[in-house]
Amino acid sequence: MKLVTYTRLHSDNVARLGIWSGDVVLDTYRAAEILGIDTKRRSLFGSMEHLLGDWYETWPELQAMAAACPEEARVPAAKVCFRSPVRRPPTVRDFYSFETHVRNARARRNLTVPPEWYEAPAFYFSNPGALIGHQAAVTRPPGTKALDY
């Protein structure tokens, strides 16, 4: 199950929570409405933040929604713009944990992967305001000649 935050293209630009499967995104709030989930609980399916805040309670309902996948709550994936899954995370930690990436980056400087790298995960705090959604255009900062992968 792929949970996404999205907006509808050429629409009101309101961020919505969805379940993405193939070429369809299921609008979870609309699905909750169709499936008769009461108004108070329905709000939990309106955003990723609300859903994650009550994860253990909402997970069974989310699975039921995905299984039912009401037609009226389906949105073609081609008609959505994916956003950052969590719109305003309080913090982001980026782990320097992919060996191939570390090896390639260090090889450019004629360095090997140090033994310490295998002993403890390295991470750094990243900018939570710089997150973007799937397939969103990455803006290259002025003066930048190349981007990392």
Which ranges hold each PLM region?
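Extracellular disulfide-bonded cysteine-rich modules/repeats
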Residues: 15-17
